[in-house]
Swiss-Prot record:
This is Autophagy-related protein 11. It is found in: Preautophagosomal structure membrane. Homodimer and potential homooligomers. Plays an essential role in both non-selective and selective autophagy such as mitophagy. Recruits mitochondria for their selective degradation via autophagy (mitophagy) during starvation, through its interaction with ATG32. Works as scaffold proteins that recruit ATG proteins to the pre-autophagosome (PAS), the site of vesicle/autophagosome formation. Required for ATG9 anterograde transport from the mitochondria to the PAS. The gene is ATG11. InterPro entries: ATG11 (IPR040040), Atg11_C (IPR019460), ATG17-like_dom (IPR045326). Pfam families: ATG11, ATG17_like. GO terms for cellular component: Atg1/ULK1 kinase complex; phagophore assembly site membrane. GO terms for molecular function: molecular adaptor activity; protein kinase binding. GO terms for biological process: autophagosome assembly; autophagy of mitochondrion; cellular response to nitrogen starvation; DNA damage response; mitophagy; pexophagy; piecemeal microautophagy of the nucleus; protein transport. Belongs to the ATG11 family. Residues 239-304, 670-853 form a coiled coil.
Length: 1165
């Protein structure tokens, strides 16, 4: 008996397995999904997602060929999952109570033996219960382990599905990306100008008296427009593909995170449960429980105390510990399963997101790789589609012609020459040779068949009157299609091999790539090889007819020499073929002259012919004597042998004839041919008439036979009909004997009625019917036996029926008694129900009053809560305002609040104060500024949660008091409470990350700045965050001010020293007031070289200087002094002009025009 195979349905979220026997009874996929939906309690069939092994989508046509199906709930793949749905999958179905301690540890036992024995038996029952719970927990643990393994298997399957989905798209993208990358790497839109200039330097050459310049084939405007188009759209294409590549890289990173999550979860499960062996613990528990039972069964008064101590101090504790371990393992497995189920939601969401991203990539790839007829080229600026990329490729190819045009032109020259040689030189020759050779072969066959018919045709006509008319096929080999004259850029130029050689040498002489020369030479060698191959084909075809002209002697000779000569040279075959063609033409000419010479009636010209010979000719018709050689000898290579054979035949048939002239012979031969044809036609006509008469006779005979057969068949049909009626009667008798087989007999009658249409098969069918009738009689006999058995069984059943009826009557009497009793009880219960309804109504009135009071209290509490929540909102906003003031104070001092690595810090930022002064104007108004810290935005986003608190007017009733609400207002309390509860949960519910902190606490802790902060300095006296930073800043500023004051004092002292030193030093340039200057007497250069006595003029005193020559001392006449040292009091500037150049007041020192001089007033020291 074959084993039953099952289809396993695995739930990916709770690990539950459902097994269905094969073949699956569901005919369609919708029915199968409906069954899964009902089994796993999923809302809708549309939420199901089914996969098979290796992440392949389910193909329901192969449902009986697969072993596992993995079920996923699509609702768990979304970004936000309903908590009730998560609870549905994480809800535990195992109900096991925690093991309790032994009752022996709790009881106070005296010295009575009876108490000991009863406590031991109670402990035995406790151990039995613990053991049963342990076995149940062991079973639950096995189920949990199986479910966890199923969840891991489902995670691997969905990951394989995502990997398969993304890999295919990524592979297509990589191929296309490499293609575009290659275009971008080899683009010519920037370097085509230099390539085109190099192409223009290529020299002009001549082919077929035509001067050709390669650069003329390219249009400069088209090249420029192509380059512009590529320059515009190629960066857009590359950027588009780079964006898609970044998306694919993010998808791969997300795949790695999912894979890492699965791997870490599996490693965690291995590390947590690899040392757990529940079966050993359970076996130990069962062994100890069995030992405890055995001890109680063998209990005696002598060893009761020892057994009691053993059970209390050792066995009971060990049993409890083992049960506790099993219970702990069960809880650990359940917690790990719930944790894995919740953590896998992120993996499912990641897989759904990456799948959507890859769908977007696939859509973009379809847009740029497949042509869309509805899309217009460059429909939008920056839009990249298939048309754009194909245009870039086309334009790049056109730009590449600036480099590859010499090579492509050379390929075109070689190809056109190859086609010319193939078509003109050889294809026509091959066609003509084939036609001629095939017609020659047909002529050989025609001659052979004519000679053979002359030899054996008359003898065969005696056996069969059908004429033997030889028919041979006609051969018409023609070359269809015109030669291509216009060959692309070469047009109708005639290309010679010398032109190709000259062109290759021209390229070799220029600065073109050496690879061009190599490729062109290789292509030219291929041209020569193609032409040589066509020559060989032509040689072979021209010698085809030689294989049908060999005589018998030639065949024997060739077979004899076959061992010595293994190969025949093609050139020799060609020569032999040409010779045979010449001989064939000679033979055809000779054959036309002496055609049918063997049938020439030479008997008339022989006088010595006797009657016996005539008698023999009547008895034996004239038969052409068989040729001594092969009939194809008429076309043999040696014409001399052919002539000898024909002359010997003529000599044997015409021993006494004279040599005739050729023209007379031809006429005579024509007459003979016509007479012979007439005789043949007459004989054929008589034969055909005889055949027609004989066939008419056969037709009449066959008609008579058909009538006779018809009569026979009618008689036979009558007989069969009689037999059929007899069989019908037999069938009716069979029907009367057994009504059970009436359906089969009706089928037989129908078959018999249908047999009227098959007259030729009636006899065979009747024999079959007789055999069936005999078999049916046997079956009827068997059925009669079964009927008798059934009748006996029916009698037994009737007896049983009577017994059951008697029992039923007695039961009915009992039921009537019970019914009466139940009616009485029902009346009593109805009375009690009425009393309970009255009590219930009274109770409902009381509860309604209490409920109304509770509703009023709830309303008051709601009002209190909303007031408190609004006060909390105001408090938080005011605290936030204080926080802003702190930040503004910090920034006014050059400090900035920042958050680095989840830690708040206050840093000194250079230039912050100047920036604030530039942006805000007056730094004195701190409150009007806006802080620059980015932490404020983060805290402001967190504190915006308090905006969800509704104002007092939005949630309180229109008129609220503590005891005068109407019923309609009371009905609104529930909605108000639900709104407050939802708002309260948003603010004060503990989050998952920190079980001990809600959102309001988090905001307050953040604004307190006590945790996750870094102080500016460690101080025992000051640990407040802002105060610590401000005090440190003040101390830094105070220290800086002290250092500056000290530095200023030192600099003032140095300044005094320098001033004192400078006051005692003589200045030599850059004269200013209070400078000490040395004046020396100097002379005045007169314009005419005259020297005026010094007594008449002022003696000039010039300042001793470096680079400042026109500083003169304003003083009276000083005599008997060689130098004067004075401190400058005032410096007056003057300038000599053309007006005052002669004035002694304005130009006392007679300086030149446009000279600037200074008059210095100084006190002599």
């Amino acid at each position: 008996m074959s084993e039953i195979s099952y289809l396993s349905i695995n739930n990916a979220h709770n690990g539950i397995i459902i097994k269905i026997p094969k073949p699956v009874r569901f005919h369609t996929l919708s029915e199968f999904k409906k069954y899964i939906q009902q089994s796993y309690s999923i809302d809708s069939v549309d939420n199901l997602f089914l996969l098979t092994t290796f992440g392949i989508k389910l193909n329901y046509n192969l449902i009986n060929e697969i072993g596992e199906v993995f079920v996923y709930d699509k609702r768990l793949f979304t970004n936000i999952v309903d908590q009730s749905l998560i609870d549905q999958y994480t809800q535990s179905t195992f109900r096991v109570s925690e093991p309790t301690h032994s009752p022996l540890l709790k009881s106070n036992v005296g010295f009575l033996k009876q108490n000991l024995s009863s406590n031991l038996k109670i402990n035995q029952g406790w151990a039995r219960i613990i053991t049963q719970d342990g076995e149940l927990m062991d079973q639950y643990c096995r189920e949990l382990i199986q479910q966890i393994n199923v969840i891991f298997k489902c995670l691997n399957t969905i990951f394989q599905f995502a990997t398969n989905f993304t890999n295919e798209i990524e592979k297509n993208f990589s191929n296309f990306f490499n293609y575009v990358k290659l275009i971008n790497y080899k683009t010519l839109h920037k370097s085509w100008i230099t390539n085109y200039k190099n192409l223009k330097t290529f020299p002009t050459f001549k082919i077929d008296n035509e001067n050709i310049k390669l650069s003329d084939f390219l249009e400069v405007d088209r090249l420029q427009s192509s380059a512009d188009y590529i320059e515009k759209f190629l960066p857009l294409i590359v950027n588009k593909l780079n964006e898609l590549k970044q998306v694919i890289e993010t998808v791969n990173e997300e795949k790695l995170t999912v894979d890492k999550f699965i791997e870490t979860s599996r490693n965690e499960s291995i590390s947590n449960f690899k040392n757990v062996n529940i079966s050993n613990v359970l076996s130990q528990l069962q062994t100890e429980s069995q030992q405890l039972t055995d001890d109680i069964e063998n209990l005696h008064y002598k060893n009761m105390d020892e057994i009691y101590r053993l059970h209390r101090d050792k066995l009971s504790i060990s049993i409890y510990n083992n049960a506790k371990d099993i219970y702990k393992n069960l809880n650990d497995l359940q917690q790990f399963k719930n944790k894995l189920t919740k953590a896998s939601l992120k993996a499912f969401n990641t897989i759904a997101n990456l799948q959507m991203k890859m769908v977007g990539v696939k859509t973009e790839m379809k847009k740029i790789t497949t042509e869309d007829e509805t899309a217009t080229e460059d429909s939008k600026v920056g839009d990249v589609n298939y048309k754009t990329i194909s245009n870039v490729k086309k334009y790049e190819d056109y730009l590449s012609l600036t480099i590859d045009l010499p090579l492509i032109f050379g390929f075109s020259l070689i190809e056109k020459r190859r086609q010319f040689e193939w078509y003109d030189f050889y294809s026509k020759g091959i066609v003509n040779n084939v036609s001629e050779q095939l017609s020659t072969i047909i002529e050989h066959e025609k001659v052979f068949r004519g000679i053979w018919l002359k030899k054996f045709g008359t003898l065969l006509s005696l056996i069969n009157d059908d004429p033997l008319t030889p028919s041979l096929p006609n051969i018409d080999v023609t070359l269809v299609g015109n030669r291509q004259n216009n060959f692309s850029i070469l047009y109708d130029l005639k290309i010679e091999r010398d032109d190709i050689i000259n062109y290759i040498s021209l390229i070799e002489a220029t600065n073109m790539s050496k690879n061009f020369v190599t490729l062109l030479n290789k292509n030219f060698k291929d041209l020569i090889a193609s032409t040589n191959n066509m020559k060989k084909v032509t040689k072979v075809i021209s010698s085809l007819s030689t294989y049908t002209t060999n005589s018998a002697d030639d065949k024997s000779k060739s077979s004899h020499e076959e061992g010595t000569e293994e190969e025949i040279d093609f050139d020799l075959n060609l020569i032999k073929g040409l010779k045979s063609r010449i001989k064939k033409l000679e033979n055809l000419l000779h054959q036309q002259q002496f055609k049918n010479l063997n049938n020439w009636p030479v008997i008339r010209n022989v006088p010595s012919m006797t009657n016996d010979n005539r008698q023999s000719t009547i008895i034996q018709p004239t038969v052409v004597s068989p040729a001594r050689t092969n009939p194809t000898q008429l076309l043999s290579r040696n014409p001399s042998t052919t002539k000898e054979n024909t002359t010997t035949n003529i000599h044997n048939n015409h021993q006494q004839s004279e040599v005739l002239d050729s023209s007379v012979i031809d006429k005579h031969l024509d007459n003979i041919r016509l007479k012979k044809l007439n005789n043949e036609l007459q004989t054929k006509n008589t034969e055909l008439t005889n055949q027609i008469n004989s066939k008419n006779e056969t037709i009449t005979q066959q008609q008579k036979e058909m009538e006779h057969m018809k009569l026979k068949t009618e008689k036979r049909v009558d007989e069969l009909m009689k037999k059929l009626q007899e069989k019908d009667e037999e069938c009716q008798s069979l029907k009367q004997e057994n009504k059970i087989k009436c359906d089969e007999v009706e089928n037989l009658t129908k078959k018999l009625e249908l047999s009227d249409n098959h007259n030729k098969e009636l006899e065979a069918k009747i024999t079959e019917y007789t055999q069936k009738a005999t078999s049916k009689t046997k079956e009827i006999a068997d059925l009669n036996k079964t009927v008798s058995n059934l009748r006996s069984e029916l009698g037994d059943a009737m007896h049983m029926k009577n017994d059951l009826l008697s029992n039923l009557s007695s039961k009915e009497a009992e039921f009537t008694k019970e019914r009466n009793q139940f009616n009485n009880d029902l009346k009593a219960l109805q009375l009690k129900l009425d009393e309970i309804n009255e009590d219930y109504e009274n109770l409902m009135e009381l509860t309604q009053a209490k409920q109304k009071k509770h509703d009023l209290i709830i309303n008051d509490l709601n009002n209190v809560i909303i007031n408190l929540m609004n006060d909390i909102k105001k408090t938080l906003l005011s605290v936030f305002e204080y926080f802003l003031e702190y930040c503004l104070v910090l920034e006014s001092m050059g400090l900035l609040l920042v958050k680095e690595d989840e830690i708040y810090k206050i840093k000194r930022v250079k230039g912050l104060k100047s920036k604030k002064s530039i942006g805000d104007g007056d730094m004195s108004i701190i409150s009007n500024g806006t802080p620059s810290s980015k932490v404020i935005e983060e805290i402001e986003n967190e504190i915006n949660i308090v905006n969800n608190i509704p104002p007092i007017s939005s949630i309180l009733p229109d008129s609220y008091s503590s005891g005068t609400e109407s019923d309609s207002v009371v009905d609104r309390y529930n909605d108000q409470s639900m709104k407050l509860i939802s708002t309260f949960n948003q603010l004060f519910k503990f989050n998952n990350e920190n079980e001990n902190e809600n959102r309001i606490d988090h905001i307050l802790n953040t604004l307190a700045f006590k945790n996750n902060v870094q102080l500016q300095e460690d101080s025992i006296n000051d640990t407040r965050f802002f105060l610590n930073a401000i005090s440190k800043r003040f101390r830094d500023v105070e220290g800086f001010a002290k250092r500056q004051a000290k530095d200023n004092k030192l600099k003032e002292q140095e300044h005094r020293k320098l001033v004192h030193r400078l006051n005692s030093k003589i200045s030599v340039n850059g004269f200013q007031e209070k400078d000490l200057v040395l004046f020396l007497p100097t002379r005045i250069d007169r314009p005419n070289g005259e020297n005026i006595p010094s007594n008449d003029k002022i003696q000039p005193w010039a300042a001793f200087n470096i680079g400042a020559p026109h500083y003169f001392l304003k003083t009276e006449q000083t005599k008997n002094k060689e130098w004067i040292i004075g401190r400058v009091k005032k410096i007056t500037e003057y300038k000599v002009t053309e007006e005052n150049v002669q004035s002694l007041e304005s130009n006392p020192f007679q300086l030149s025009v446009n000279v600037t001089w200074y008059l210095v007033e100084a006190d002599e020291e």
